[in-house]
Structure formats: C-alpha cells, structure tokens
Amino acid sequence: MGYLYYLLHPYQLRSIIQWKVWHDPVHERDPSTESPELQECFRYLNLTSRSFAAVIQELNHELLVPITLFYLCLRGLDTIEDDMTLPLEKKIPILRNFHTTMNEDGWQFHESQEKDKELLEHFDVVITELKKIKAPYHEIITDMTRKMGNGMADYAENEEMIKNGVQTIEEYELYCHYVAGLVGEGLTRLFVESELANPKLAERPSLTESMGQFLQKTNIIRDLHEDWQDGRRWYPKEIWSQHVDKWEDMFNPAQQTKAIECVSHMVLDALKHSEECLFYMAGIKDQSVFNFVAIPEGMAIATLELVFRNPEVLKRNVKITKGDACKIMFECTQNLFTVCEVFKRYTRKIAKKNDPRDPNFLAISAQCAKIEQFIETLFPKQDPKKLTLTQAQAQNKEPTMDAGEAVVLFGVVIAALVCISGLMLGTAWFFGARFDHIFREASVFLPGREKATPMITGHEEL
C-alpha cells in the first residue's frame, strides 16, 4: 500500500505507528538459548505462517516451543493434503500415519510441490525438537495429529465431495472440525496442561469447537473466489442452493444480488459462534495466551464485516487493511473488555449494512442484537442519558420520611397540642372560669362514688 493511501487515510498510519511503538510483548523469545535445530524450527514458522508467527513467539516460555512444534506438524500435514500432484494411493497412507512418521528420526519428504515443501524437506529438525518436550505435551500433539490426519484422509477419499462440493451444513461443519476444531482442542489441552487456562475449559468442548469453527468459516467465506479458481467448493449446497440455481451463478454478474445474499447467509452461520468465543476467552489466565487466542478472533469478526454485502468478495480475495489489523491487534492484547468492544463495533457495522430486502435480514439483525446482549451480560453498564434522567426525576420527587423522622414529627405535633390546650385553659382560669364544679360533677362517674340526688324545686310531681 503506497504513501498516497496513508496520506489520504492518516488514521490507518496512526494505528500502525501505535502498534509498532506501544506494543510491549509479554514474553520475548531468546534465540541465544536455543539449539540450532530449534532456531531452524522458528525459521520455518516465520516462512509458513504470516498470521501466527509473531504472536506464537510472544507466548509464555512454558508453551512457546510446544505450540511452535504443534503448528509445524499440522502445517506439514496440511501441505501434504493440499498437494494435488500426489496420487491418492500415496497421499492417504502418509496422512493416516503422519502421527507415527513424525517420531521417526531423520524423516524427510521430498515429493511435494507445494509452496511450503521446504518444511517437509527438512522435517527432521522438527522431529529432533519434538523428542525434547515434556511427555504430556508430546502426547497431545501426537493425538491431535492422528485425528486430523485421519480426518483429512477421509475427505481426500470422498470423491463425491471432491466432485460436487460440500452438500450439507453438517458436512461443512464436520470439515471445519477436522481442519480447525481439532486445532482448538489441542491448544486447549496444552493451555490446561500448562495451568495457563481454567481447567473447566477442557470440560466444555463446545466452547473450543466454536473458536475453531469461527476462524475456519471466516476463511472459507473470504476465500470464495480463490477456492473457485482452484476448483474447490466449501460453501455447502444446503445454503447456496437457496439463492442461486447453479454454483457458477455465484460468479455471474447478472446474479450478483443473489450471490451477495448467499454470502450474507454464510456470515450469519459464522456469527452464531461469537458468544461462545467470547466466553472461552474469559477462561484464559495468562496474558500471552489470551493475546494468542484473542487476536485471530478479533481479525475474524472484522473480516466478516468486510465481506458482508461486499460484491468484491465475488471477484477477488479481500483482506482487512494493515492499519485496521494493527488497531485490532492493539485492542485485543489488552483484556476481555476491549475484545468485546471490538466485537461490538464490528457487529454494529454488520447490522448497519444489513439490507431489509435480504431474505435473512431479520435473522442477521437478531443475531447481531444477541451478540450485543451477551456482551452486556459480561460487562453491564448504565446509559449516561438514562442515569441523568433518573437523577433529575429523583430531585423533582417529593422527599419521603423514614420511621425515625415520623416518630419525631408525631412527638412535635402532640407537644404542640398540649401547649396550646394548656395556654387556653390558663387564659380561661385567669378570666374567672371555675373548673372545680366541672371536676366535682365529673367525679360521680368514677367507680365507688354515688350519683347525687337532684333537689325538687318545682311542681312537676303533681
């Protein structure tokens, strides 16, 4: 991207500078303490990974080497699977037995034509370092490689899927499980084994699965045009057939509106994993591990917003800008709250771009609202406008008394009545009023007193 772009978009340049200047790695790798073989492993990590190399090398030293080797093993496996020049009768046994082959001293593979073939040609350095890590870590890496290798072999043998593409959403999610869900499972086991994550994460496989599904589905949605050119079709027919009659119509300019609606449908399917991804990240204890899992998820939600209702995704492989990537990385290396803010920001952008004419308009709007509602349960906060209104209403409201104030007020009223009554009686007595007759007449009503007999003064008895 040229200088002119950054002159026209200074905020992009600001984000890049902010990341370069202010980002402080939690842990730094020390090459001086590494063996020549391990240094070679990190060189291949940098060669084969653009997205994960930097963040892996900032991991806690307890997991730095195990996760690097785990990545290289899976990258080697993936290189063999992607190599279309290898005949199936040769590829399938390698995939199914890779978990044992990667423990054979000196093993190398020189028949691949893929871009990452150099890793396989010098895979013996990975094997050497694998034998040095702790036994529990080695066991986890071997087990995950076995599961993934068998899953890849199953798909390689599935001629129907290779010819006609993925048919159902269930098949689509099973594929995502093998290529990404298993990676998440292995990483979670490593996090828990190293005591850098809440052990309860190991008991919630759905959370781990959502982390992998969210990333892989995002990649598949974004790589639509590239996969089509390579003869691959990962969009499930169960989804695209609701919008176009033939797969080729997705790239027909006359069918662009329908194709965009299909991509929107795929984005909706990916967004359903958002809440569980955020919940998973809440279980990470170590900051470097949190950065490792949060950065890809932040990039994924930004990528979904980029491809949503974007016709360019039908013509080329679109990517978020370097400035946006640096801004997201800076925010995702803080804490869960800032990650939630990233998700909220891009979710709102998706909701804003949503088109009422889209068949999934209501479902997409509801899913975006659901994500925001979930974030609100994690970090509830009051609306300043509502808070100001509540305070104003409280000030205008009649003051209320508590029990103590009521007793005091009652006592004051009684005392006032007594004083006023005493003053009136004293005034009457001063002016000659006689109260003794009143008291004498009233005394006859007291117990033990006889009532006075009235004197006869008239002739009423006659």
Curated annotation (Swiss-Prot):
An MF annotation (GO) of this entry: squalene synthase [NAD(P)H] activity
InterPro entries named in the record: Isoprenoid_synthase_dom_sf, Squ/phyt_synthse, Squal_synth-like, Squalene/phytoene_synthase_CS, Trans_IPPS_euk-type, Trans_IPPS_HH
Compartment(s): Endoplasmic reticulum membrane; Microsome
Keyword Lipid metabolism assigned: yes
Pathway it works in: Terpene metabolism; lanosterol biosynthesis; lanosterol from farnesyl diphosphate: step 1/3; Steroid metabolism; ergosterol biosynthesis
Record's keyword annotation contains rRNA-binding: no
Record-level GO cellular component terms: endoplasmic reticulum membrane
Main subcellular location: endoplasmic reticulum
Membrane topology: Single-pass membrane protein
One Pfam family hit: SQS_PSY
Catalytic function, reaction form: 2 (2E,6E)-farnesyl diphosphate + NADPH + H(+) = squalene + 2 diphosphate + NADP(+); 2 (2E,6E)-farnesyl diphosphate + NADH + H(+) = squalene + 2 diphosphate + NAD(+)
GO BP: ergosterol biosynthetic process; farnesyl diphosphate metabolic process
Keywords assigned: Endoplasmic reticulum, Lipid biosynthesis, Lipid metabolism, Membrane, Microsome, Steroid biosynthesis, Steroid metabolism, Sterol biosynthesis, Sterol metabolism, Transferase, Transmembrane, Transmembrane helix
Disulfide bonds: none
Stretches that traverse the bilayer: 406-426
Function according to Swiss-Prot or TrEMBL: Squalene synthase; part of the third module of ergosterol biosynthesis pathway that includes the late steps of the pathway. ERG9 produces squalene from 2 farnesyl pyrophosphate moieties. The third module or late pathway involves the ergosterol synthesis itself through consecutive reactions that mainly occur in the endoplasmic reticulum (ER) membrane. Firstly, the squalene synthase ERG9 catalyzes the condensation of 2 farnesyl pyrophosphate moieties to form squalene, which is the precursor of all steroids.
Note: In Fusarium, the biosynthesis pathway of the sterol precursors leading to the prevalent sterol ergosterol differs from yeast. The ringsystem of lanosterol in S.cerevisiae is firstly demethylised in three enzymatic steps leading to the intermediate zymosterol and secondly a methyl group is added to zymosterol by the sterol 24-C-methyltransferase to form fecosterol. In Fusarium, lanosterol is firstly transmethylated by the sterol 24-C-methyltransferase leading to the intermediate eburicol and secondly demethylated in three steps to form fecosterol.
NCBIfam families xref list: squal_synth
Family of the protein in this entry: Belongs to the phytoene/squalene synthase family.
Name of protein: Squalene synthase ERG9
Organism annotation: Gibberella zeae (strain ATCC MYA-4620 / CBS 123657 / FGSC 9075 / NRRL 31084 / PH-1) (Wheat head blight fungus)
Lineage: Eukaryota, Fungi, Dikarya, Ascomycota, Pezizomycotina
